[in-house]
Amino acid sequence: MRPIHPGEILREEFLVPLGMTAHALSQAIHVPATRVNDIVNRKRGVTADTALRLARYFGNSPEFWLNLQAAHDLRAAEREAAVRIEREVSPREAA
């Protein structure tokens, strides 16, 4: 299964239901339009600064946005490197 990017959540759970464009959101949270567009299009992750702004605007927490990003990053890393890491790293034996 493909990792869900926070931009997909932003678009499908927030922007679409509100009938809001990425450009309108960028103006509302005072960031460049490219930042929001890149997040919505899965080209950029959510930073702490953006998480604070989104949380303030939508009335949720910055942790909500950062947790989405961390979960996405971890799933992506697992898909990319899990087999290699299993080959390279042995579990520590119990004492």
Language model features with spans:
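Residues within the alpha-helical elements of helix-turn-helix
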Residues: 17, 28, 57
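Short alpha-helical "recognition helix" segments of helix-turn-helix
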Residues: 21-27, 54
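Recognition helix of helix-turn-helix/homeodomain-like DNA-binding domains
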Residues: 30-46
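Short, charged recognition helix plus adjacent turn
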Residues: 11, 64-95
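Short, basic-rich loop-to-helix N-cap that marks the start of a DNA-contacting helix
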Residues: 43-56
